[in-house]
Amino acid sequence: MDVEEVKAFRDRCSQCAAVSWGLTDEGKYYCTSCHNVTDRSEEVVSAADIPNTKINSINRGLRQRSKHEKGWDWYVCEGFQCILYHQAKALETLGVSPELKNEVLHNFWKRYLQKSKQAYCKNPVRTSGRKAKVLEDSVQSSDLGSDLELLSDTTCPLESEAEFQSDPQIPKPFPVTKGSPKSASVCSGSVDGVEYSERKEKGLVKMTVPRTLALCSLSLLWQRETITVSDLLRFVEEDHIPYINAFKLFPEEMKVYGRDKGIFAIESWPDYEDIYKNMIELAIFLDLPRFPDITEDCYLHPNTLCMKYLLEVNLPDEMHTLTCQVVKLTGIGEVDFLTFDPIAKTKRTVKYDVQAMAVIVVVLKLLFLLDDKLEWSYSDLAEAYNEQHREDTPQFDFRKWYQVMKKTFDEKRRKWEEARARYAWKTKRPLYRSHIDKSVAYKRRKMVENLQKQFSALVGSSPVVEKQAPSSFQFNWTEEGTDSPCFHGHSLQGLLIMKGQSMITKNSLYWLSTQKFCKSYCKHVTTYEESNFSLSYQFILNIFSFLLRIKTSALHEEVSLLEKKLFEKKYNESKKSSGSKKGRRH
C-alpha cells in the first residue's frame, strides 16, 4: 500500500489531533506524530503482488525503520543515554550501590534532558529547530532543598508504556525518547546528528562522551562512594568502564555514521583535569544543590584517603599520625571545605585523591626535607641501626624504599606504556561518513583484520593480554625478603624526637615548593620545572602522579597550595618583605 492510500484515512488523532497516519505490521493505523495506535485497521495488501509498492509500517513496537539503513530513527541523546546506562551497570559490577544507577544518575540525566531542552519539556528541541519552553512548574535550584527533586514522569510523559516495553535492548532505568517519523539524515545515522553538532546556545552544556564520565563522577560524589576520579580513569584504562568506542554497545539498529563519528568516537584517553572541569560545569548547569556532607567517616575524607595511599606507596603506617596532624592544621578536613556546593560563590570541587597525595608529599618533606642530602644521611643511620638490631622493629630506610619503589614503578610504567601502545583504537564496528560508504568501510576493516592475522602468523602468536581484575590498589606489597618488600610496619623512631609531651620531627628545616604564586590570567597558581627541584622530590611526584593518572605539575600545584595553608605565616612574612623591597625601589 502506498503512502497516498494511507492519507485516505482522514480522522484526527485522539491524542494530538494530527492527521498523519501510517500502518503497523498488524494493519492498524498509527499516528506518525505521537505514535498513538487506533482501533481502526486496514487490510494490508502483500507487497509481493504489487511491484514498486512501499508500505509505511513500523516494527519492534512503535519504532520506525530508516529507509537508508533499515535501522531505528534515534536521537543523539539516546546514544548518550545508552552509554550512561552501561557505565552505570559497570560501576554496579565494581561494587557501587544500585541506587547510583536507579536514582542518582537517573535523576541527574532527567534533569540534564530538561535543562538542555531535549525532553521533559513541552516542545523539545528537535531537527526542526523549534525552541522548547520549560514547564512552568519545573523545579528551581532554590526549591530543591537537601534532596534532589525533579519533574515526575507524569508531568510530561515522553513515551508510552507500550513503546517502553517493546524493546528489551533499551536501558529501562532511563526514559526513552520517541523516534521521529522522518528518516535519518543522509549525513548521520541519528536523526539530529547534524543539528546537534551545529547547535550553539549561550549557557548550553552539550553532552559529550567525556561528560558522561563527569556525570558518573558527580553521581559517585553524591553517593559518597569509594571510587575517586583517578580510580574512575584507571578503570576506564583497564576496560572495566566503557568509554573508548562506547558506541559499539549501541543496539545494531542504531546506525552510527557521518556526524555521529565526531560526537561518539573518542580517540584519546580521558584527562583528569578535563573531567574535573566538566564536573563543575555540569553541576552549575543542572543547578544542583549542596551535595551530602563529607564527614570524617567518609571514604573521601583526607584522613581515610591518606591511609589508603600510604598503603599504596608502601610507606610506614606511623606516618598516618603525621598526615592527620597536617590535615588538622591546614583545615582541609572540615566539612564545609570538603563538601561540594555548586550554588556557593567558589564553585569548585575538592580533588580528594590529589589532595591526599599532596598531604603525604608534605609529610615526607617534613621528615626528610628531600634536598638530595638529608634523606641519604638519615638512610645511613637507619641502615646501621637495622644491622645492629635485627630482632627489633626495623627503622624506615629511605634509600631502600627508593630502590624498591623505583624498580617496581619502572616495571609498572613499562607495562602501562606497552598496553597503551597495543591498544586497538579501531572497533569491529567501523564508522563511515555516510551510508553510501558503508560497504567500503567494512571492506577496509576486513582487509586490516586479514593483514593483522597474516602478520601475527609471520611473527608468531602474540601474547594474549589478560584483562586485569578490578582492584582498589595498583601495587601488591609482600613480606620482607621478597622482590617487593613491605615497609608498612617499619618505625619512624630515628626521625622523631620527644619535645615536652609530644613527638616532633628531628628535621627542623623546610623548603617551599612555590615561593610566589602567579596572579596572571593563565589560571595557573604555579609552574613546575623539574630542573629547579631535587631528584628525590621529582621521583616522588612522578610516582604519585602516575598512580593518580594526573600530570606532575598538577600534584606540585596541590602541594604548593597545601603548603600555603600550613605555612601561612611564613608566606605572609615573605609577601611583606617583597612589598617593602618594592617600596625601597621607588
From Swiss-Prot:
The modification N-acetylmethionine is found at residue 1. One of its GO terms (cellular component) is RNA polymerase I core factor complex. It is found in: Nucleus, Nucleolus. Belongs to the RRN7/TAF1B family. Its main location: nucleus. Component of the transcription factor SL1/TIF-IB complex, composed of TBP and at least TAF1A, TAF1B, TAF1C and TAF1D. In the complex interacts directly with TBP, TAF1A and TAF1C. Interaction of the SL1/TIF-IB subunits with TBP excludes interaction of TBP with the transcription factor IID (TFIID) subunits. Interacts with TBP and RRN3. Interacts with FLNA (via N-terminus). Part of Pol I pre-initiation complex (PIC), in which Pol I core assembles with RRN3 and promoter-bound UTBF and SL1/TIF-IB complex. GO terms for molecular function: RNA polymerase I core promoter sequence-specific DNA binding; zinc ion binding. The keyword Zinc-finger applies. The gene is Taf1b. This is TATA box-binding protein-associated factor RNA polymerase I subunit B. The modification N6-acetyllysine is found at residue 438.
